[in-house]
């Protein structure tokens, strides 16, 4: 039996500012990356998102970020590893509190935005994230980019490192994401994306931007829900996996 997780970023409204269609996303995914207040979300949004996840039977993960609410966590923060570890631990603890009140717990951790991209190569910040997860306890899995410094650090620390793929992103022949500055970086055709993700789940390969075949090891697929048409694409990917007989289930 082939099993694949679908994850998405949720809980990103802040105060009167809305973002994404979490209700639609929850109908499609098995794991929810809940913003913890540092790049998006607030205590009330976090609490309601956890309640909605419980109602939908979706696993809750902590979507931790640099302390960059104004920039939506998309800007690098040149902080010390100790400060970063403290920030990540703080975010995990905050989400765990509201998750428990909602009847669930934090089951995994996924870095967001600039933090996610930085710890692909930044050894010190990668280790800081791992240290925070270890300090939190429970040896939670980390959802990370294959081949990243963070993935190696997590495995070295005895944590489960779960590699993920991105449904709507193009890949280079080397198996890395095409830069958003280059053609083919973002895919918009839902049928094409669905076909690619079914193929990935079945045989672990994708067609790279140059037409070659590239092997991608992924235990989870990220489907975005915060851009126009993205929730519908997530639903189509889920339906395609279901039709192919692939079991969609959280890794955590």
Swiss-Prot record:
GO terms for biological process: carbohydrate metabolic process. Keywords: ATP-binding, Hydrolase, Nucleotide-binding. One of its GO terms (molecular function) is 5-oxoprolinase (ATP-hydrolyzing) activity. Gene3D superfamilies: Glycoside hydrolase/deacetylase (3.20.20.370). Its EC number is 3.5.2.9. This is 5-oxoprolinase subunit A. Pfam families: LamB_YcsF (PF03746). The gene is pxpA. It comes from Kocuria rhizophila (strain ATCC 9341 / DSM 348 / NBRC 103217 / DC2201). Forms a complex composed of PxpA, PxpB and PxpC. Catalyzes the cleavage of 5-oxoproline to form L-glutamate coupled to the hydrolysis of ATP to ADP and inorganic phosphate. It catalyses: 5-oxo-L-proline + ATP + 2 H2O = L-glutamate + ADP + phosphate + H(+). Belongs to the LamB/PxpA family.
């Amino acid at each position: 039996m082939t099993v694949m997780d679908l994850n998405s970023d949720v809980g990103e409204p802040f105060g009167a500012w809305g973002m994404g269609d979490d209700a639609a996303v929850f109908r499609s995914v098995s794991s929810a990356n809940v913003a913890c207040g540092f790049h998006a979300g607030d205590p009330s949004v976090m609490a309601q998102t956890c309640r909605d996840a419980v109602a939908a039977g979706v696993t809750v993960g902590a979507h931790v970020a640099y302390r960059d609410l104004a920039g939506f966590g998309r800007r690098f923060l040149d902080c010390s590893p100790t400060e970063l570890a403290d920030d990540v631990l703080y975010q995990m603890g905050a989400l765990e509190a509201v998750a428990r009140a909602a009847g669930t717990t934090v089951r995994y951790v996924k870095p967001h935005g600039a933090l996610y991209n930085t710890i692909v190569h930044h050894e010190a910040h990668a280790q800081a994230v791992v240290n925070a997860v270890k300090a939190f306890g429970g040896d939670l899995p980390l959802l990370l980019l294959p081949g990243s410094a963070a993935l190696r650090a997590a495995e070295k620390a005895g944590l489960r490192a779960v590699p993920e793929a991105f449904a709507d992103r193009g890949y280079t022949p080397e198996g890395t994401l095409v830069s958003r500055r280059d053609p083919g970086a973002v895919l918009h055709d839902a049928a094409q994306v669905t076909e690619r993700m079914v193929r990935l789940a079945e045989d672990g390969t994708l067609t790279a931007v140059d037409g070659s075949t590239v092997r991608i090891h992924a235990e989870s697929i990220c489907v975005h829900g915060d851009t126009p048409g993205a929730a519908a694409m997530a639903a189509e990917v889920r339906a395609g996996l279901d039709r192919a007989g692939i079991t969609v289930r959280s890794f955590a």
